[in-house]
Amino acid sequence: MDLGLRGKVALVAAASKGLGRAVAEELAAEGAKLAICSRDAEAIESVGNEIAQRTGAEVLARAADVARTADVDAFVDAALSIFGRVDILLTNSGGPPPGRFETLDRAAWQKATELTLFAPVEFARRLLPGMKERRWGRILNVTSITVKQPVDNLMLSNSLRAAVTGWARTLANEVGETGVTVNNLIPGYTRTDRVVELSQVIAKRDGITAEEAVARWEREIPLGRLGEPREFAALAAFIASERASYITGQSIAVDGGWIKSLL
């Protein structure tokens, strides 16, 4: 199925590994041009070169910390200078650290807010005007299953990703008439560094191995396994495409059935 992404320009944050990299690879395979960033300059340059060589896509790779407004602005400026526009925005960042409420001070909340909430807001603030002017745009936010079903020991993620969900849903209402869609993608337990980190935290807390922590999650998932980044990326490419032009304001899970709620 042709998704109609050939020639579109996609900006993908935190794309040196994990879900961000998988989405960047999928969009490039569909013919999109890419602007990708990561805090690790060497890693993102390597990923950019690899994607370009494998797919033939035009790729701009830049080091940027999405929690810093100056870095977001510099990255967006570079993308607009090279490509002239951005049609697709995928906001993404490493999740905030685990922890219970009593272990988190104001500084932890502030740092997590900059990373998880303000980063997508800043990207949208810069790129939304151009999308509205062209009457076509896709904003996709990578959030978490915690917005549907909070997870123990993830106070920051549970709280701030819910804030992103409310912001995105409201923004979808505000810009729908301009041809711009806004959706959230909800990854479940997927084979990424983030899940490895969480498995190690649980292992230390509960006196088990990381492998046993993963097996515990797998028993909670109807499909009986962790997801793969490419499975998440397939949904992202579809939601970013012309084929998904009547989908907006939604939070769509790729979780193997882990979420138990009806809605």
Predicted regions and their residues:
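Alpha-helical segment proximal to the catalytic Tyr-Lys
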Residues: 129, 173-174, 245
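Conserved glycine-rich cofactor-binding loop
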Residues: 9, 14-17
